[in-house]
Amino acid sequence: MNVSASLTPFNTSPTQKSAPMILDTLPDPAIEGQGCPRTTRVQIDLILLAIEALELGGSEAILGFAEELELNGIIKDRVNLWRMRSTNPLRRANIRRPLTIIEAKALVVIACYLSRRLTVVIRQMLMIYQQMNDKQIPLEQNLRLSNYLERFRAHFKSRMNPRRSGFLALTSDDKIDELAINLLGKLLFCTGTAGMQRFWISLFDGEVE
């Protein structure tokens, strides 16, 4: 069974030079400077990593939605997207540049729109996980969930640097699986009422409740 869902973007109008209005739905955080804190950069990259593990064409979908939502003036191409995500200090190819607030907003908007397209898949997988966990059934016995966890582990291990301090708590497959399931919960949170705004705020003032 394939976890992938169709995420084909629609045609859009040309990008305008001013910041897209959709970004105005996310409040500017009360932080010093124009760059995002370390935790914010990590969490945004990880939520996108979970989407890539859910959707085989995740990277292309991110770029497609950037165009659809008129955010391609911010997320211009694959290299530009990689540079933004590489501000995550846990990455092997970490880039020492700030992730600006407007870049972070664009990534969060896209992540939340992708989450909405994948709501049914995310909800089903969390339900399967809960049922299997309650009955103490190994997760690998469910193909859909197993495929997601396997892809997430592969993405995580290939892109994150095990020598980074934040990696030390995630040295086992079980711990990485826990992270993957936790991120599914955050993706579902993004699909709820005012989920995008609430998730955005949580990136700066604490964990999603």
Question: What kind of region is each of these model predictions?
Answer:
Residues 116-200:
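Helix-turn-helix/homeodomain-like alpha-helical modules used for DNA recognition
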Residues 93-118:
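DNA major-groove recognition helix of helix-turn-helix/homeodomain DNA-binding modules
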Residues 74-89, 145, 149:
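Major-groove recognition helix of helix-turn-helix-like DNA-binding domains
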Residues 43, 103-106, 141:
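Single-residue recognition of alpha-helix capping/boundary positions
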Residues 37, 58, 72, 77, ...:
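Intrinsically disordered, low-complexity coil/linker segments enriched for acidic/polar
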